[in-house]
Amino acid sequence: MSTIRKPSPPDMYDCIVVGAGHAGCEAAMALARMGHATLLLTGNADRIGHLSCNPAIGGLAKGHMVKEIDALGGMMGLWADEAGIQFRTLNSSKGPAVRATRAQIDRDAYLRVVRRDIFAQPNLRVWQDMAESIIVEGGRAAGVRTAYGQEFRAHHVLLTTGTFLQGRIHVGLNNFPGGRLGDAPATGLSASLRAIGLELGRLKTGTTPRLLRDSIDFSLMEVQPPDDPPRPFSFRGPGVRLPQLPCHVTWTNERTHEAIRAGFDRSPMFTGVIKGTGARYCPSIEDKVARFPEKERHQVFVEPEGLESPECYPNGIPTSLPLEVQKAMIATIPGLENAQIVRPGYAIEYDYADPVQLRSTLETKALRGLWLAGQINGTSGYEEAAAQGLWAALNVSCTLRSMPPFLPGRDTAYMAVLVDDLVTKGTREPYRMFTSRAEHRLLLRENNADARLTETGRALGLVDDTHWQRFSTKRAALHSLLDELENRRITPDAAARDIFSRLGEPAPTKGVSLADILRRPSLTLPDLAPFWEGVTRFADDVREEAETIVKYSGYLARQQELVARSARMEDTVLPEDMDYTVIPGLTREIVEKLGKVRPHTLGQAARISGVTPAALTCLEIQLRKMGQR
């Protein structure tokens, strides 16, 4: 990886990253590590990498993306491992496709490790200021103007502004400007984006009140212990470092719901004060009570904010109700009867750009050199933001180096499903990733993210020598173990029959491979040790992946067949300037949709709502005609 000098403000940057949340930090680190002169612009340098909402990273589909970021050489997994205080594997009793890692994070520790690495990174400069407008020259983005009157020039500008664009905070019927509680919003940038030609909408998200830990009676709650041993996110890091803490579980009740309903007339959501659309899959507690009146209780996870933090986060009750209603509501929940609120829950409205206005690289269609990543694209969640930040950074780098873009398929990464959904379908509400959004999710397991993406990260210059060596060693061990399992055969002699008897399994009538034995539903890889003690020599992660590949070989083969069947459409590129109005057989509605989305491939065109098989045939015929010309 090349190293260049740290530039001064008047110099030309390769890329300016505006916003230092999860998308911005991931993007800035990746660009700088790949040798590009990068400026990270933030309104508050003390809160770089701040966890604005819940103190947790990972979860269903989200943990998968953290692993993918790590496999490509990104940072979130390493940072989470260093600051994690409770690691749990979700869906551990279910199939490998939906098992996911989630970690409670020490909020202050995470901030420290992110800031440490950002400020120590060569090629990366931090500047505290607010971007006010995009500089446009020669039909492309050329830099930003700031509130301090500075002009910073760059070949590319990447906006990762989170909830800060015209952000407005609501607590009851009181509201005021803010990017999050305690930080000013970005007030000028939205007008600049509209002038460029981007259409902006309005979204809403919310967070819970924070509670004083010493005022909580944990004895009235169910204890949720961490996994022992903890399973880290990073394939390449030193593992989990901090002591592990429990979380606690309690529930709302009818008294809670009565207190909430009593505040409906002062709710900014129910009185129409909030205009932005909220997250369908992370509703406020007042929304849950209103929409599900038949539910007698809702779960609340009381999560530690850190090893030394005096605060706890009651996950499950985000709210924008007035403070007095929040107090009354909290006081009805078992264990929280005497809990003191340190910070109120609140909702925040902010501007976003419908991502259908982006290319698959996350560059805007309206202006070359301008890129968007994170919540500005209508997503919710730290992991979705970080994945987009890395995606955009890799594509900025590819553009700077005149390389083909980084565009993995939906069968290769959850982050590819995320981006494809965004740029193909757009979104009118905060988008959250789920495993159900991926049609090839058995291929997209947490434990094979490195196998799927590390080679790509190496080719792009983000995977360093140490990471590559560790991956290569693991890959060689996996191939060796799989080879042994397929080729080492067991003859059903007396000794073998005795082993099968002790395992409670019928002995085979003829010679079988170890892989054949492992495919039995009740057996796991350690059960094979009496047949071949060499199985114990392999690391746990190698054995886990080998067991998955063997046990699910039939399902995996069928998924690969489906991928191969659709490969032709995914590999058929549509010209960006294709004139859909002249193609015979396309309806006006389909012409409008194709013209708006400008799909990169025939496969992407097929995923646009309303584009029919007949329309795809028309596109194929037109491509053949163009090829003949």
UniProtKB/Swiss-Prot annotation:
It comes from the Bacteria. Signal peptide: none annotated. It is found in: Cytoplasm. One of its GO terms (biological process) is tRNA wobble uridine modification. FAD binds at residues 19-24. Its main location: cytoplasm. Pfam families: GIDA, GIDA_C_1st, SAM_GIDA_C. GO terms for cellular component: cytosol. NAD-binding protein involved in the addition of a carboxymethylaminomethyl (cmnm) group at the wobble position (U34) of certain tRNAs, forming tRNA-cmnm(5)s(2)U34. PANTHER family: GLUCOSE INHIBITED DIVISION PROTEIN A, PROTEIN MTO1 HOMOLOG, MITOCHONDRIAL. This is tRNA uridine 5-carboxymethylaminomethyl modification enzyme MnmG. It comes from Nitratidesulfovibrio vulgaris (strain DP4) (Desulfovibrio vulgaris).
